[in-house]
Swiss-Prot record:
HAMAP family: UPF0346. NCBIfam families: PRK13672.1 (NF010193). It holds the Pfam family YozE_SAM_like. This is UPF0346 protein OEOE_1017. Belongs to the UPF0346 family.
Length: 76
């Protein structure tokens, strides 16, 4: 069982300047009041982003963010 949700992890990736694509995603998601903040389900978050996140230029960015999230959870 994961100790924290994806959104909580994503917020640790925010960076105001010189951000990579995942950090830019985090910056934009911060302002998305409808983001499924409590979800830990890849499919649920992915569907939400596909339908409601014009700030995400490519789902590959989400896939990379999810990989980093899973890797960070393995370190805990």
């Amino acid at each position: 069982m994961r100790s924290r949700g994806f959104y909580e992890w994503l917020m640790t990736q925010r960076k105001p300047e010189n951000a990579d694509e995942v950090q830019e995603f985090a910056n934009a998601a911060f302002f998305d009041s409808e983001f499924p903040k409590q979800s830990q389900n890849f499919d649920e978050i992915s569907k939400y982003l596909e339908e409601n996140a014009p700030y995400l230029m490519s789902m590959e960015v989400f896939d990379e963010a999810w990989r980093r999230f899973l890797a960070s959870e393995e370190e805990l």
